[in-house]
Every structure is written in C-alpha cells, then in structure tokens.
Design a protein with these regions (language model features):
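Bacterial Sec-exported substrate-binding components of ABC uptake systems
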Residues: 1-77, 185-222, 332-340
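Short helix-initiation/N-cap motifs at beta->coil->alpha
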Residues: 53-57, 111-121, 141, 254-263
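A short, structured surface patch at a secondary-structure boundary
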Residues: 68-126, 130, 135-139
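Short secondary-structure boundary segments
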Residues: 73, 135-138, 162, 277-281, ...
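Alpha-helical, coiled-coil/dimerization segments enriched in small aliphatic residues
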Residues: 96-98, 231-259
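Extracytoplasmic ligand-binding site segments that recognize negatively charged/polar headgroups
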Residues: 98, 137-145, 155-185, 216-239, ...
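Proline-aspartate-enriched helix->loop->beta-strand connector
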Residues: 120-133, 263-279
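Structured C-terminal subdomain patch of bacterial secreted/periplasmic proteins
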Residues: 173-182, 273-340
C-alpha cells in the first residue's frame, strides 16, 4: 500500500446518505464564467512526488502514484481507464452504465465490488492506496465509509471536485474548464501526466469544433420520474452541455444541478425539444411512452413530433464523457432541425 501523509483533518464536508441513480447528489456548478476550483494540486512540477491533493476540503499527500485503486461511480472508473491506468484498478462499484466502447477492453477484467456503494470492509480487503469517488456521499457513513476512517488507515481518498456539497468547496457552476482541470489533476495523481495532457487537448479540440445551434430552441432535460419529472437545472452538467449545444434550458433559473418540475410547468414552458436521459433503470424509450400517455404532455408539439435527443446517463455527470456528449447531441440536434 502506498504511503500516505495526512496533510489536514477532515473539514466536515462529508456528504449525507447515498442517493440512487439520477438523484441530485453532487452540488455541482454549471456553465458560464469559470468558478474557483474546490480541488488543488501541489505546486510540484508534473510527475513529481510526494504530491499534495485536496478535494472537498480533505487534504492528503500521495508519496507515489497509487498502484491499487478502487473507484466508485462510472465517472471515476472511466477517468482512470481513459488515463491508461486500468491495470491498477483492483475494484469498481456503482456503475451507471456500460463504459464507452473504446474503454471496454481495459475494463473487461476489472473486479466489480457492488452494484451500488460497496461496504467499507470490502474496499479495505483490497488494500487500496487510493479510493476515488464520483459523489461525495459515496464516501460517507451511509456509503462506502467515512473519508476520515480511510485517512486514519493510510488510504488516500479523492472525490470529483464538481461533486463537493459544502458551500465553501462547491463551485458556483460547472464549466468545461473545471471538468478538464479534474482530468489534469487525476493524471498527476496517477503519474499519467502525459496521458492527461493528451486527453485534455483532444477534448478542447473536440469542444471547439462543435457549432452550437443558433435557432434559439428551448429544451427540457428529462432525467427520471413520471408523477413529477426530475430534470436538469441551471448549474450542473446538463446546463453546461445544453449551453454548448445551443439549447435554452427551460429550468435554467433553478440554482441547482437537478430539480423536480411539475408537468404543468413543463407544459407551460412548451419546450421545442426534449433531451431524454437513457439509463438501464429508466430508458429513453420508457420516457417517451410516459410523455405520450401523460395527458398534460401528450399534446405538446415536441412530443407529438417526437423532437427527442438522447444522452446516456453516465454522460450526464461531470467527467470525461461530457465533451463527447456535446458532440453527439449537437449532431442529433442538427438532424432534428433538418427534419423540421
């Protein structure tokens, strides 16, 4: 197990109980001007260790690149795979869906600890030197155990900075700069600086190549729920992605990552298009059927004319899949505009 020097005590920003798929767990910030990052790497040059890192107010020092990594949530697992460190994954948990096809070979033999949050005992049995989580609540008493406990046992923990829930650590809004900063920082932690730089450069180029729609279309980001829909609000990954595509979010005024929005409010907003989140537990097709049988939404032009865009659930949380989601949704939107 890699040595760990604790740089600071837990600052009290551990999350509350674990939430289910699609829940508004991370208090992420959304698009627009850059917000201060809640994570900070040491001033050491790239590739230098020891390396001090901080996420959500919890500081630690990695004495060397971790060799035994446990990830919780798809965003964390896919980040490690994308940076070429999949052979150091000794366990994963809480997958939100299949990994991208290009990462599937590297993920094929990685052990799966649990469908949701693993027990802390199961994690510790693997003797990890890093536990990397996508949600702050993944590392809590109701999740895979408190971060302080891991610290006391010499195990480093890291939470996606966009997922910090404490007001003093949470970015005001999610931006692509913050997403790419996480790629850079995780690359430094893993000793994969070059791979991280290449991924960041590729994603910046891909994002720059996207031409947002200028049609002024409004959109509803429909994640889950039938009695009351659960939708993308104004400061998280859905807002960031819609901005990049050129869609006006009908729930942009809600200062949260996700929110409940009554069907009557949806009907009043009368969105031009509906973005459907496709998850194994709540498919895009199921959401189409829900919209078509709901008397409040069945008469909406977007529903009657099937003006739908589809995005996979793992791409809806801050991570390396956000930029590809922009490219894909922009292409879908262009086809939809031609069809109209």
């Amino acid at each position: 197990m890699a040595g760990l020097a604790v740089a600071a005590l837990l600052s009290g920003c551990a999350g509350s109980g674990a939430t289910g798929p699609g829940a508004a767990d991370p208090g992420v910030a959304g698009p627009g001007e850059a917000a201060p990052s809640s994570s900070a790497a040491s001033a050491s040059p790239a590739g230098a260790f020891p390396l001090a890192v901080s996420s959500c107010g919890v500081d630690a020092t990695l004495e060397e690149p971790p060799e035994r990594i446990v990830t919780i949530k798809s965003s964390a697992t896919e980040m490690v795979l994308a940076l070429g460190a999949g052979d150091r994954l000794v366990g994963t948990a809480f997958a939100d869906g299949d990994v991208p096809a290009e990462l599937a070979p590297a993920a094929a033999d990685v052990p799966v600890l649990a469908e949701k949050n693993p027990a802390q005992e199961a994690v510790l049995e693997l003797e990890p030197d890093l536990v990397y989580a996508g949600w702050e609540s993944n590392l809590s008493a109701d999740g895979a155990g408190e971060r302080q406990t891991y610290q006391d046992l010499g195990v480093a923990t890291y939470v996606s900075p966009s997922a910090c829930k404490g007001a003093e650590h949470r970015p005001e809004r999610l931006t692509f700069d913050l997403v790419l900063e996480e790629i850079t920082e995780v690359g430094r932690m893993l000793g994969e600086d070059e791979a991280a730089a290449e991924l960041v450069a590729a994603q910046r180029a891909e994002l720059d190549a996207v031409v947002p729609s200028g049609a002024g279309l409004t959109a509803l980001w429909y994640s889950s729920g039938e009695d009351v829909p659960y939708v993308g609000a104004g400061i998280g990954a859905p807002q960031m992605i819609m901005d990049a595509v050129g869609l006006e979010n009908v729930a942009a005024g809600v200062q949260d990552t996700w929110t409940s929005l009554g069907w009557e409010a949806v009907a009043e907003a009368n969105p031009d298009v509906v973005v459907l989140v496709d998850a194994a537990w709540n498919t895009a097709e199921h959401k189409k059927e829900a919209l078509e049988r709901n008397p409040v939404t069945a008469t909406l032009p977007a529903v009657q004319e099937e003006r739908y865009l589809v995005v996979p659930f793992p791409a809806t949380e801050a991570g390396m899949r956000n930029v590809p989601a922009v490219t894909d949704l922009a292409a879908q939107l262009a086809e939809l505009e031609v069809a109209r």
